[in-house]
Amino acid sequence: MTDHAAVETGADSRPDTRPTKIMYVAEATAHGGRSGYITSQDGQIDLKVAMPPAMGGDGDGTNPEQLFAAGYSSCFHNALVLVGRRAGYDLTGSTVAAKVGIGPNKQRGYGLAVALSVSLPVIDQEIAAKLVDAAHQVCPYSNATRDNIEVTILLG
C-alpha cells in the first residue's frame, strides 16, 4: 500500500482517485509465477497458473490476464449497477465482458490493453451511454488503469 503522505502532488492535473479510507484488503500469494499457483489468504482462491498457448505455454491453468479480465468485468458491472440504481434504472439482465490482451511495449517490457463489452438490453442507447460513462468514473479498475493502459468500452 502506498503511504499517501509520501506521494507528491501538484504537478499532475489528474483527479486524485486514491481511497480516503480502505474498506477491504484482498491478499493473494503467487508461487512460481506463470508456471505455478496462486492462493488467497481467505482460501477462496487456489488456482494453477500456466502460460497460455499463444505465449508458448500449455494453457493448463489460469493466467493473470484471465484474472484481470474477471476482476475488471465484475468491478465495472458493479459500478454500472450502482450508477444505474442511483439514476433510477433497473439493470437486471445487463452484462459486462472483458477482454485483456498482453504484448510487448516500447520500453522492452509488456503492456495490457482492455476491451469491455457492455450489454444493457432494456435501456435506451443514449441513457446507456451516459450510465457507462458514469460507471467508468466510479469503477476502481477504471480509475487504476486510466491514462495508463488502453481501455475501450463497447456498448452493444
Residue ranges with predicted function:
Residues 2-70, 77-156:
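Extended beta-strand/beta-hairpin segments
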